[in-house]
Amino acid sequence: MACERLGGQSGAADVDAAAPAMAAVNLTLGFAGKTVLDQVSMGFPARAVTSLMGPTGSGKTTFLRTLNRMNDKVSGYRYSGDVLLGGRSIFNYRDVLEFRRRVGMLFQRPNPFPMSIMDNVLAGVRAHKLVPRKEFRGVAQARLTEVGLWDAVKDRLSDSPFRLSGGQQQLLCLARTLAVNPEVLLLDEPTSALDPTTTEKIEEFIRSLADRLTVIIVTHNLAQAARISDRAALFFDGRLVEEGPTEQLFSSPKHAETARYVAGLSGDVKDAKRGN
């Protein structure tokens, strides 16, 4: 078995957040004996955007993947603590496919399936049998329209998605994720490989999604985090250094590591620690 749980269950009372939609509770995890995250506790409010920030290797992407159980099959993966979705441990879901319907994920680079544009949008809808077949086209049109891609593809729904531009492929993947009506949307640097125009379009759309979803985004782009998120969190060396309202974290951080990072001076964790 690739995934091993260490220690007992943890209680949600350790998380300082009012009825979060999702929460990590004393989460520690690692691979092959190396600790990657250490005692992380934080809540993600419903209908809000939370940005996860930190230098490369800080643990933020591993944390995001854990929220979707993407690390389960990685050799040597061990964890203790818990992650709660609506108060229920995500590790107690036997049907991982259903869990991932509720917690969708968009990756750094587009990953369309090797099937038609239409079939890409409907892949999850078919797998979960969400609507009758006669409603398939309506679902596809609604989601493609929502992400601003319908006009560009409506006359070539049977085409390969690999004929689309990189930005269009990412929008297609977003439409596919939203087609199964997730409650939480995880985004792993979704605009890092895109042009400024498509980036702006996706950022605006992310903000609109917060009206109905819990959105959690990993980003190295400080300006992006400031623009789109309601809350932000900073990771350093596997630790959650600070989290709170985005404006507060940028304008009056509580920790020296945070101050250095938002000022663009980070990169050496040891140097940041000397400033404490």
Swiss-Prot record:
Primary residence: membrane
Pfam family, any one: ABC_tran
UniProt topology in membrane: Peripheral membrane protein
Reported induction: Slightly induced by phosphate starvation, part of the pstB3-pstS2-pstC1-pstA2 operon.
Lineage top rank: taxon: Bacteria
Gene Ontology molecular function, alphabetical: ATP binding; ATP hydrolysis activity; ATPase-coupled phosphate ion transmembrane transporter activity
Location(s), subcellular: Cell membrane
SS bond partners: none
Record's keyword terms, sorted: ATP-binding, Cell membrane, Membrane, Nucleotide-binding, Phosphate transport, Translocase, Transport
Reaction catalysis annotation: phosphate(out) + ATP + H2O = ADP + 2 phosphate(in) + H(+)
Single GO biological process annotation from the record: phosphate ion transmembrane transport
ABC transporter domain: residues covered: 22-262
SUPFAM superfamilies xref list: P-loop containing nucleoside triphosphate hydrolases (SSF52540)
Keyword Membrane annotated: yes
Listed EC numbers: 7.3.2.1
Binding site for ATP: G54, P55, T56, G57, S58, G59, K60, T61
GO cellular-component term (any): plasma membrane
Enzyme class per UniProt: translocase
PANTHER family tied to this protein: ABC TRANSPORTER I FAMILY MEMBER 17
Assembly notes: The complex is composed of two ATP-binding proteins (PstB), two transmembrane proteins (PstC and PstA) and a solute-binding protein (PstS).
Family the entry assigns: Belongs to the ABC transporter superfamily. Phosphate importer (TC 3.A.1.7) family.
The protein's role, per its UniProt record: Part of the ABC transporter complex PstSACB involved in phosphate import. Responsible for energy coupling to the transport system.
Protein name from the UniProt record: Phosphate import ATP-binding protein PstB 2
Gene name tied to this protein: pstB2
